[in-house]
Amino acid sequence: MTPSLANFLWSLVWGTVIVVIPVTVGLVFISQSDKIKRNF
């Protein structure tokens, strides 16, 4: 693997991590607060 390809793959990995983790936490938090409000 060339260094530029490795850097590209790592940037994809970190970009995915940076996007996916906050979205997942946010969705879980919203669904939890929705349950409390709606008394489901």
Swiss-Prot record:
Transmembrane segments: 10-30
First-listed, main subcellular location of the protein, grouped into a coarse class: membrane
UniProt GO cellular component terms: photosystem II; plasma membrane-derived thylakoid membrane
Subcellular location: Cellular thylakoid membrane
Domain of life of the native organism: Bacteria
Keywords assigned by UniProt, alphabetized: Membrane, Photosynthesis, Photosystem II, Thylakoid, Transmembrane, Transmembrane helix
One GO term (biological process): photosynthesis
Membrane-topology annotation of the record: Single-pass membrane protein
Subunit structure, as described in the record: PSII is composed of 1 copy each of membrane proteins PsbA, PsbB, PsbC, PsbD, PsbE, PsbF, PsbH, PsbI, PsbJ, PsbK, PsbL, PsbM, PsbT, PsbX, PsbY, PsbZ, Psb30/Ycf12, peripheral proteins PsbO, CyanoQ (PsbQ), PsbU, PsbV and a large number of cofactors. It forms dimeric complexes.
UniProt record similarity statement: Belongs to the PsbX family. Type 1 subfamily.
Function: Involved in the binding and/or turnover of quinones at the Q(B) site of photosystem II (PSII). PSII is a light-driven water plastoquinone oxidoreductase, using light energy to abstract electrons from H(2)O, generating a proton gradient subsequently used for ATP formation.
HAMAP family: PSII_PsbX_1
Protein name stated in the entry: Photosystem II reaction center protein X
Organism phylogeny: Bacteria, Bacillati, Cyanobacteriota, Cyanophyceae, Oscillatoriophycideae
